[in-house]
Amino acid sequence: MSQQHTLPVTLPPALSQELLDTVPPPVNTQQEQRKQPAALPPPCQEVPVELPVEGPSKHEEKHMTIVKGAPEQECEQQQQPQEQKLQQQHWEQDEEHQKAENPEQQLKQEKAQREKQQLQGQLEEEKKLLDQQPDHELAKSDEQLGTKKEQLLEFPEQQEGQLKCLEQQEGHLELPEQQEGQLKCLEQQEGHQELPEQQEGQLKHLEQQEGQLKHLEQQEGQVKHLEQQEKQSELPEQQRGQPKYLEQQEGQLKHLEEQKGQLKHLEHQEGQLELPEQVGQPKHLEQLEKQLEHPEQQEGQLKQLEEQEGQVKHLEQQEEQLKHLEQQEGQPKHPEQLEKQLEHPEQQEGQLKQLEEQEGQVKHLEQQEEQLKHLEQQEGQPKHLEQLEKQLEHLEQQEGQLKHLEQREEQLELPEQQVGQSKHLEQEEKQLEHPEQQEGQLKHLGKQEAQLELPEQVGQPKHLEQQEKQLEHPEQQEGQLKPQEQQEGQLKGLEQQERQLEQPVFAPAPGQVQGIQQALPPKGEVLLPVEQQQQKQEVQWQHK
């Protein structure tokens, strides 16, 4: 009976064996799929996956033992739920693994799952139909089932190909999990690479700063040159044409204040650039830092410039006074103006004080020379030293000029070198013929003496030429010395004579003028009262 029962079942066991032989490959393919992710970066390997590998072997043993005397339907019914469970487990695991990988893969997997579910539904319907069909139709249905199962088996192979393609795409697209790990690595690498990049940027910035500091050094040289020019402008010979130049200097001072703000900004930037051991930093930066450590010196220089501006304004006032004196010289000298000038001896005293202040300025120039020497020691720059040497030579020339001017002032104070002596003497001889004009002449002489005490009046070149001509003729000078000494005596007694001019004055003859002048006491003698002098003059006229 067993043989008769087994004879019709010979074909189905072959099919069942084929099914049993074909079922395990999905497990192997899925194992291969799980082995492939091992090639992925470390973040992708963290997903733990455990596969029930021993399951298929047990099922195979059971099916092999049951096939001996079991019908075809029982084998198929036992195999189908087990296969479905295994496939569902694998699908769920694949879904979980793929969800962690990429959302695009999830969509593709969902489509594949839908197709599988449709195929499974079709298989179940066909199996139900097979249960109802007779045995002769089982062969055809088994063939159809085999083809469909082959399709099912081929489907995971397609999935493997798709997974490989996706893995290749992932190698280009970098999954977010891989990206996190790679970003960390990149951040570490960038942390090492950012230093040279930052250093390069800093070097460029430092080069720009060097250019700015060189420009500032040039401007400092210009400022020093301006200081020299301002010092030169303190000299009375260089008082003209300064107002426009002063406006330029004020603009330059404003520009210097802006540069001070830039220097402070650069110091702030250097404080921020505290990276250790910058690559290839020039040695020039150390020198620049040392220079920036002394902003107080720059402030002191600016204060000196401001003080010099005040001095320049004072010089402008002196220029206006000189212009006023020029206008007065060009106008005819009336006795009323002369009286007003004699009434203000305080102005003359103020002018003498100005001369003393100028001498103090010369001393200040010497102090500034010492400061320049000190700056030379601090800076130690050859180009700047050459400029300073030129400046010192120029200052020495200026000192020589000042000494020469002082000598000229001393010469002008001497009575032997009075300005326009010959012309004034002729005018005085003509005016002495008229006793009414003696008062105006005396006042005029007082004004001349006051003007001779002023420093460097306009028109000195003409007077100097006259003096040179006079020096060429010493005989004339000897003849002129006597009346000059007499004029000095007259000037000293002007104030006393003005008070006593109410007494009558006798008009001398034209030839008697020189006798009157000789009657006056020479330089250094004591003057007698006005009445005694007049009596002497009357006696001399009577004798003549």
Curated annotation (Swiss-Prot):
<keyword id="KW-0963">Cytoplasm</keyword>
<feature type="compositionally biased region" description="Basic and acidic residues">
    <location>
        <begin position="202"/>
        <end position="234"/>
    </location>
</feature>
<comment type="function">
    <text>Part of the insoluble cornified cell envelope (CE) of stratified squamous epithelia.</text>
</comment>
<dbReference type="InterPro" id="IPR000354">
    <property type="entry name" value="Involucrin_rpt"/>
</dbReference>
<comment type="subunit">
    <text>Directly or indirectly cross-linked to cornifelin (CNFN).</text>
</comment>
<feature type="compositionally biased region" description="Basic and acidic residues">
    <location>
        <begin position="462"/>
        <end position="476"/>
    </location>
</feature>
<dbReference type="GO" id="GO:0005737">
    <property type="term" value="C:cytoplasm"/>
</dbReference>
<feature type="compositionally biased region" description="Low complexity">
    <location>
        <begin position="76"/>
        <end position="90"/>
    </location>
</feature>
<dbReference type="InterPro" id="IPR019571">
    <property type="entry name" value="Involucrin_N"/>
</dbReference>
<dbReference type="InterPro" id="IPR019743">
    <property type="entry name" value="Involucrin_CS"/>
</dbReference>
<dbReference type="GO" id="GO:0031424">
    <property type="term" value="P:keratinization"/>
</dbReference>
<dbReference type="Pfam" id="PF00904">
    <property type="entry name" value="Involucrin"/>
</dbReference>
<feature type="compositionally biased region" description="Basic and acidic residues">
    <location>
        <begin position="283"/>
        <end position="297"/>
    </location>
</feature>
<dbReference type="GO" id="GO:0010224">
    <property type="term" value="P:response to UV-B"/>
</dbReference>
<feature type="compositionally biased region" description="Basic and acidic residues">
    <location>
        <begin position="423"/>
        <end position="437"/>
    </location>
</feature>
<feature type="compositionally biased region" description="Basic and acidic residues">
    <location>
        <begin position="304"/>
        <end position="347"/>
    </location>
</feature>
<feature type="compositionally biased region" description="Basic and acidic residues">
    <location>
        <begin position="96"/>
        <end position="117"/>
    </location>
</feature>
<dbReference type="GO" id="GO:0001533">
    <property type="term" value="C:cornified envelope"/>
</dbReference>
<dbReference type="Pfam" id="PF10583">
    <property type="entry name" value="Involucrin_N"/>
</dbReference>
<comment type="similarity">
    <text>Belongs to the involucrin family.</text>
</comment>
<protein>
    <recommendedName>
        <fullName>Involucrin</fullName>
    </recommendedName>
</protein>
<dbReference type="GO" id="GO:0018149">
    <property type="term" value="P:peptide cross-linking"/>
</dbReference>
<feature type="region of interest" description="Disordered">
    <location>
        <begin position="1"/>
        <end position="520"/>
    </location>
</feature>
<feature type="compositionally biased region" description="Basic and acidic residues">
    <location>
        <begin position="252"/>
        <end position="271"/>
    </location>
</feature>
<feature type="compositionally biased region" description="Basic and acidic residues">
    <location>
        <begin position="354"/>
        <end position="411"/>
    </location>
</feature>
<keyword id="KW-0677">Repeat</keyword>
<keyword id="KW-0417">Keratinization</keyword>
<feature type="compositionally biased region" description="Basic and acidic residues">
    <location>
        <begin position="124"/>
        <end position="152"/>
    </location>
</feature>
<feature type="compositionally biased region" description="Low complexity">
    <location>
        <begin position="477"/>
        <end position="494"/>
    </location>
</feature>
<dbReference type="GO" id="GO:0030216">
    <property type="term" value="P:keratinocyte differentiation"/>
</dbReference>
